[in-house]
Design a protein with these regions (language model features):
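Active-site mouth loops of central-metabolism enzymes
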Residues: 1-8, 64, 68
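Glycine-rich phosphate-binding active-site loops on the catalytic face of alpha/beta enzymes
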Residues: 12-36
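Conserved, mostly hydrophobic/aromatic
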Residues: 16, 103, 165
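Flexible, glycine/charged-enriched surface loops at secondary-structure junctions
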Residues: 27-28, 33, 52-62, 88, ...
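C-terminal helical cap(s) of enzyme catalytic domains, especially alpha/beta-barrels
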Residues: 30-52, 181-184
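Long, charged amphipathic helices and adjacent flexible linkers at domain junctions
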Residues: 43-79
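Nucleotide-binding motor/catalytic cores of P-loop/tubulin-like NTPases across gene-expression machines
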Residues: 99-101, 107-144
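C-terminal binding/interaction regions
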Residues: 160-168, 172-173, 179-185
Length: 188
């Protein structure tokens, strides 16, 4: 019944973000209180502030690590490359969402756009940290899918001419867990 969170509530939400939590939710009494919209806005502000204070340390995450899966290796390569290039976005064309999940486990300020043809995958991806899921039309042709992805990013104002982004996909297309390609693109 209070429009302003307590210091403890702010601390709990901020620490959850700093601990790498994918999602935060309201308790029943907060969600049903007198100020539900204000509470959500405040939580967004707290989460955003906590995320921007974090320092990206991908070198520490990857140093001495061996990845057993090809899709995981490609996901980590996309994160590392995008971070060091100052890429505007990372795009994962994904059936199951596993590539985006691998990426979301590491702190990076570059937004991750997970493009999927499956509504169930899009819904699951909505809970992953720093992942913005987009539903797209199905395409069996890799080049067509890559062009569609860039068109989606441009249409939404995510990238513009001259921006660099990283994109991952599998060849052949449509195989869950089959991500085996990383491409660095410059928007023309």
């Amino acid at each position: 019944n209070n429009p302003v969170p307590t210091r403890a509530e702010v601390s709990d939400v901020a620490n959850a973000v700093l601990d790498g939590t994918d999602a935060v939710m309201l308790s029943a009494e907060t969600a049903a209180g007198k100020y539900p919209l204000e509470v959500v806005r405040e939580m967004v502000a707290i989460c955003t502030a906590a995320e921007t204070t974090e320092v990206v340390r991908l070198d520490n995450d990857f140093s001495g690590k061996v990845f057993a899966r090809i899709d995981q290796t490609i996901a980590m390569g996309a994160l590392f490359t995008a971070h060091h290039l100052g890429a505007k976005a990372i795009v994962a064309l994904t059936e199951s969402g596993s590539t985006a999940l691998w990426m979301s486990r590491h702190l990076i300020h570059t937004p991750i756009y997970a493009l999927t043809t499956k509504l169930s995958t899009q819904r699951k991806l909505a809970l992953y940290r720093n992942v913005r899921p987009l539903l797209v039309d199905s395409s069996a042709d890799r080049d067509e899918a890559l062009a569609q992805a860039e068109a989606h990013l441009k249409k939404r104002g995510i990238v513009e001419t001259g921006d660099v982004y990283a994109i991952t996909c599998g060849e052949p297309m449509g195989t869950p867990g089959g991500t085996n390609m990383l491409k660095i693109c410059r928007v023309s």
